[in-house]
Amino acid sequence: QSLNTTFLGQRSYSEELSDIWGYEKAGSEYALVGVYNGISVVDVTNPSTPVELAFFIGYESIWRDLKTWGDYLYCINESNGGLQIVNLTEVISGDLNPTYIENTDLGFTTAHNIFIDKSGVLYVFGSNYSNGGCEMYDLTTDPENPIFLGVFDDYYFHDGMVRGDTLWGGAIYGGVFSVIDVSDKSNPEIIGSHSTPNTFSHNCWISDDGDYLFTTDEVSGAYVAAYDVSDLDNIQEVDRIQAWSGYTDVIPHNTHVDGDFIVTSYYRDGVSVVDISNPSNLIEVGYYDTSDDFSGNGFNGAWGAYPWLPSGNILVSDIENGLFIIEPKYTNASFLEGIITDAITGAPMSNVMVQIVGANYSSYSE
């Protein structure tokens, strides 16, 4: 099933997939795919015929996350091997022996996730370094030999992202997202936190203007939630939403902001596109189900979705069904808003049914 999305292409794998990232070079586009037994680099410039350029065999793991800095791919997993580094320029040029490094000298051998900011700082989450908070490394001096800068180790982070000097982290076992000042990498400080609807905060992403944060809880029946974070002393949840299918027990996984929209990999529901132009009124405006064989609760289907290729195409990693290339039609929602008042007193009224004439839809005033 789909809405405002078009299937463009697919590549199957013999092993299950995990996360995905994208890469662009000289007008060509590539999918970087986490596979159970390694890393797959796929040319998706022609999305109807994706072509694998290279496969790097790694330790077997159902968790494999990857990001890029410049022309390098960085990858971790939860089995072994530390930080894996691939020179993508060599892969694309057809080098038969491209650089592939397994660096186990950085203080960790396993991790759950990574993020790389625009300044070339690598953030490692959920590793076997002490409490598994967030280790920080400089990539700019030598991309093949990261330099340790510092660590936030007050508690475990499952995932996170950084904008400027602010780290937004999913403290999954604490049931909150945390806000960390990382301007001094040797002395990061907590500057805010807030609970999430299902207290199992997996992933979070900040809006382009920096005023709103969007989170997922990786449990059955959870929500994608929006928060006003413009005042860290007074963080407010402003709305929450579940995906399109009607199954209330589906699990959301990773959400990412792309302008006025969030694109969320939603396990058995596939991919969801939500209009966030009004964060206090989240509206789903698109979806694509990559997993027809599964529905409801369960860890199958869409693991990751990457929405930032220059073409606008979305890359999706489906655990069982492989790599999907989807074309979204980003469509803004229509909003009907108002205040229902008592005709005599003029006071606002709650719990009043509002029905759209000619449409099978009704709702209640708050």
Question: What are the residue ranges of the model-derived segments?
Answer:
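Short, acidic Ser/Thr/Gly-rich low-complexity loop/linker segments typical of extracellular
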Residues: A347-P348, Q355-E366
